[in-house]
Amino acid sequence: MITIDALRIRDGERTLLDGVTMHLPANAVHGIAGEGRSALLRALYGLVVPDAGRITLGGHPLRRCDVGFAEAEPRFWPGLTVRDCLDLAVRYNPGSNPAAMLRRLPVPLDAEAAALPEAERKRLALVLLLLNPKRVLLLDEPFRGLDVESAFMLRQLILQLGSEGRTVLVAARLAELDGICDDFYVLGGGVVRGRYEHYEFARSVREAAASGIAEK
């Protein structure tokens, strides 16, 4: 169980999250929609230090070594090819199978990773994340920039991860979470506006619209 307790994050004068509390069971796919979703994932990974609140995994502070993170705008070291990145991933994750992932999310092996177009950089970042055996996986805007086929394949991979016993958090537009999450939260104005089970998607859309929460 990941517990987010009264999390508060400010960015200068702006409050991104204001006392957000969530209880996220293990071995499930959880969706996060609404304003502040990326800030929440960055706090879970330790890239943002909360102004207040706690994040725990099984009652203990969540550690970065337990978490894998695919950022919304992935960046790679200049000069490294896609093949170099995959070789490093296999070195740190023996037994992983990049070829199987590349069949679903293809990326040109001999291209420089940092020079790839946005969609291909996104696919590479997702492949590297999915090769990682971490207990918790964070996907920030994973569908942004993907073509229809790649987005479909990614949805199948996310469903597979949930069935394999991983805990996956997907920060995305509300419409993109339909059909892949066990439950999902909608944020707005820095707080949780609603929590919904997977079968309550239509209700979540109605309530988000009634609350004036725009899809971004």
Language-model features: locations:
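Conserved ABC transporter NBD signature motif
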Residues: 50-65
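Q-loop/switch helix immediately C-terminal to the Walker
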Residues: 73, 78-94
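Hydrophobic anchor residue at the start of the ABC signature
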Residues: 126
